[in-house]
Regions:
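An exposed, glycine/acidic-rich loop-and-rim segment of catalytic or binding clefts
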Residues: 1-362
C-alpha cells in the first residue's frame, strides 16, 4: 500500500513579514490536505468522488493577503475562544476580563486578533500510515484580554484510509477559558451551493439565539423544529426563512448540543463519536464528522455575498458552503447551564475531530 507523505513549499508573506509555509499531506490513496502556517488554515482538502475525480471540498482564497484582509475565517484555526462571548467580558474566580468586541458588540472567535491571524510554528512527521504536521503557538498572558499564558498545539493528520484528524492540546499557567476549532467551509460538490446537500446532525437539542447571535436561554429539543436533523435533511429546505430562528440568521448559524455533551475543558477529551454526516448531490461524496467536543456550530455561509473570489476566480456566494465547527458552547464562560470551558494550571485541554469519507470504502 502507498505510504502517506509530507511536502512543503512557500505560500507568500504574512502581514508580519514572515514567510508563510504550505504543508501538503498526501494519503497515498488519492486524498490530500494543504495547511498554511498563517492562521493554521486548511487551504485545500482534495477528495476523490465515487468516479475517482478529485476536487477540493473546502473553500479557499488565492493569497495570504486575501486571507489576512478579507477572509471570514475561511479554513482557519479559531481561538482562544471559538464562537461568541457576550459583551466581550466574563468573570473567572472573581475577576472580570474584557475581550475586544468585533461582532455586534460581542467578542467573536477570540477577538479581532485571534489565532486565525497568527503565524504558527510547524513540525511535519509521519507515523504508521499517517502523514501529519503539528502546529504550535504561544499566546501570552493578557492576549486579547484572556488571562494566562497558553501553549497550544494543533495537529493535522491524514491517514491512508482517508481520514483527516485535527487534534488540539492546550496548557495554561493561570486559570483561563478555552474553546478551539477549525472554521473550514465545506462544499462536497466542489462548486455551486450547498442547497442540494443533505445534512444529518446527531444531536437532540440546539441553542436558540438572539438576533445578535448570543444564546437566548437553555438548550431546546430539536423535535418538531427546522433544527431536527436527526435524519438526513436537504439543506435547501431547512435554510428557507419559514422558521423565525432561521429567518433571523439568514440560514443556520447555531450550535447543536451533541449527545454526551458533558465535557469540561480541563479534563480528558470526551468520547469520540459521530456528530454529523454531510452528503453531496447524488452521494458523489460523503463526509462524516466525528468529535470529542460537546457542541457543533452549523453555519451555512449566510454572510458570503460574492465579493470574495477563490483561486479559480469563482465568486463565493451565500450558502456556497457549510461550516461544521466542533467546539465548546457559545458564551459558556457566562452561562451556568453549560459545561465548563475553564482550563486550570496542571490540566491539559484536549480535543479531537475526524473528517471521514465513507464513500471511499464502499
Amino acid at each position: 500500500m502507498p505510504r502517506p507523505t509530507v511536502h512543503h513549499r512557500p505560500f507568500g508573506t504574512a502581514p508580519s513579514g514572515e514567510e508563510v509555509g504550505l504543508w501538503r499531506l498526501e494519503s497515498g490513496t488519492g486524498l490530500h490536505a494543504e495547511i498554511l502556517t498563517y492562521g493554521g488554515i486548511l487551504h485545500t482538502l482534495g477528495v476523490p468522488d465515487t468516479a475517482g475525480d478529485i476536487d477540493s471540498v473546502v473553500l479557499s482564497l488565492a493569497s495570504v493577503d486575501d486571507y489576512a484582509q478579507k477572509s471570514p475565517y475561511i479554513g482557519a484555526l479559531i481561538g482562544r475562544y471559538a464562537n461568541r462571548i457576550a459583551d466581550g467580558r466574563f468573570t473567572l474566580d472573581g475577576t472580570t476580563h474584557h475581550i475586544p468586541c468585533n461582532d455586534r458588540g460581542h467578542a467573536l472567535h477570540g477577538g479581532p486578533e485571534g489565532f486565525d491571524t497568527r503565524m504558527w510554528d510547524a513540525a511535519p512527521f509521519t507515523v504508521g500510515d499517517s502523514a501529519a504536521v503539528r502546529l504550535s503557538l504561544h499566546s501570552p498572558d493578557g492576549d486579547m484580554g484572556f488571562p494566562g499564558a497558553l501553549d497550544v498545539t494543533a495537529t493535522y493528520s491524514l491517514d491512508a484510509s482517508g481520514t483527516l484528524s485535527l487534534t488540539f492540546t492546550a496548557a495554561t499557567d493561570r486559570p483561563t477559558v478555552v474553546s478551539l476549532c477549525n472554521h473550514s467551509y465545506f462544499n462536497l460538490a466542489g462548486t455551486g451551493d450547498i442547497r442540494g446537500h443533505t445534512l444529518q446532525v446527531d444531536a437532540p437539542a440546539f441553542l436558540p439565539v438572539r438576533a445578535d447571535g448570543i444564546p437566548q436561554g437553555p438548550a431546546v429539543g430539536v423535535a418538531g423544529t427546522a433544527f431536527d436533523l436527526t435524519s438526513p435533511q436537504l439543506l435547501g429546505d431547512r435554510v428557507s426563512p419559514a422558521d423565525d430562528q432561521v429567518r433571523q440568521a439568514g440560514g443556520f448559524d447555531h450550535c447543536w448540543v451533541l449527545a454526551d455533551a458533558g465535557t469540561d475543558a480541563g479534563t480528558d477529551a470526551g468520547t469520540l463519536r459521530r456528530a454529523a454526516r454531510l452528503t453531496a448531490p447524488g452521494a458523489a461524496r460523503v463526509m462524516e464528522v466525528w468529535t470529542t467536543e460537546p457542541g457543533l456550530q452549523v453555519y451555512t455561509a449566510n454572510q458570503l455575498d460574492g465579493s470574495l473570489m477563490d483561486g479559480t476566480g469563482r465568486c463565493l456566494e451565500r450558502h456556497s458552503a457549510v461550516c461544521l465547527e466542533t467546539q465548546r458552547f457559545p458564551d459558556a464562560p457566562n452561562r451556568a447551564d453549560c459545561p465548563s470551558a475553564v482550563l486550570r494550571p496542571g490540566a491539559v485541554f484536549h480535543s479531537r475531530t475526524d473528517f471521514r469519507f465513507p464513500h471511499l470504502s464502499t
